[in-house]
Structure formats: C-alpha cells, structure tokens
C-alpha cells in the first residue's frame, strides 16, 4: 500500500524533456536509488539493519538512497503516533554522515501530508531543518512540474522563509525535469518571477554538482547562463560538495563541477561551507540557515555586491 513504483521516476511517465539517452539513464538511476532507500526503510526492523542495507547501495548514489530512506522513516513516524522516533534514532546512528540528505527526505512526506510540519521542524536540527522545505519543493517540482514552471507559487501553507527553501528544492527539480539540458534550464528559470530566480539557481548548482553528470563544457555554459546569479549557483555547488564530503562519497565529477562552478576543488568548497558556520547566529528577520548561505555566496561575489551578514 505504501510502495512507490519505478514508474514514479520514469522520465517518459513524468513527461520530462531535454535529456539525452545518457542523462535520462543517469537521472533515472538516481531516482531508482531513492526508491530503493525508501522501500528498505519500510522493510527493515531497526535503524541499524537499515543502515547496513543502505551501505550496499553503490557509493555514488548512496546518499540519495539515504534520502529515500528518510522519507520512509518519516512516513512511518507519521503513521505510528505511539512511536515517532525513527528519524531521530537514524540521525543519531547510521544516518549521521548523511544528515543533509535525511533532512531533505523528510520534506517529501511533508509534501504528501502537508499538516503539522512546523511541529516536525522543531524536532529537526535547528540549522538544517530548512532542508525539509527544500525537499518539499523538489517533490512538487518533480511530480507536478507543468504547473510550477507555468508560474504557480509555493503552497499557500508556506510562510516567510519556508517559501524560499521550497524554491531552492524546486530549483533542484528543474535539473531533472529538463534532463540536465542547460538551455532549457536557463529558459525555465528566466520565465519564473524575478524574486524567485536566485533560489532556483542555487538549487540548480546543487543538483548539477550532486546528481550530474555533464561535461566540463556544459558546466561552463551553465555558469555563464546563471549570469548575475553565479554566486547562488556556486553556493549550491558548495553545498553539494559538503554533503558528499561528510558522507564520504566525493567523486571526480564533484571536483570537476566545483572547479567550474566555484573555482575550487570539492574538498575546498566543502571546507568553505564549514568556515561560513563560524559564529553563525540568526537575527530577528533572517534564519541562520539563510545567513549561512549568504556568507558562502559572498565568497563568490564582487566586494561591491556583498550582502550584509
């Protein structure tokens, strides 16, 4: 009853466009890893057993399997009010090194059961909890892309910065919807309202770096297409490098992507995100998560354009 079929990530079924045969196979395999993790979470009896099974997934796609597992665990937490500790247990154990992906995976459940999510957020990491809204945005962009690229805003339930986090995830989904086709991606974002484009480019930077895989030439084209949003693109790429570095699944492609999009090797891009956490505090209007993002973006921004942090 709770299963998700392979058709859920089939590009033809989803109506996605722009992908070469290679990219379609590549991105469908990424989706397949998510489904594998999701179903493992429903089948395994303990977080330890789940963690052990997830380590059998190919290293490059293992983080996505952890993301899918997080959706499964979060769904079980929701369905069993007498036991709502699966996500927290997983984060304390086998899921610790994949904490970024797990927070994103929780958001898939929020997208499907969109109530009580603010109570859920309070149980997540105070900084990374915003990634669940990112996961919500990815889910909506992936499964309902026609209405969102036609201009539908984030759900009315979302307020304030929740809407921006949603758009960061929606931006990630555009990498899949457009099959990694740089021209289509740029065109899709340019058709969105101007106040959303910076967050969409941030999401693209993350997806292009984490999920890939395109050529060095295509990455250079992506950077040029981002134009004034190159700092946001680079910040997303740095986030991807950090997620992979913490999980121990950096690849040669990760470094290629960060070299082009950030001007840094992957390990240095990941280190930059750590440095940006120093003395990080929220203010009355801006979440600490957004201040963190801005600090990273400022590293890639000419001095005259620096944002206050």
Language-model segment annotations:
Residues 1-309:
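Mature, well-folded catalytic/scaffold domains that follow N-terminal targeting or propeptide regions
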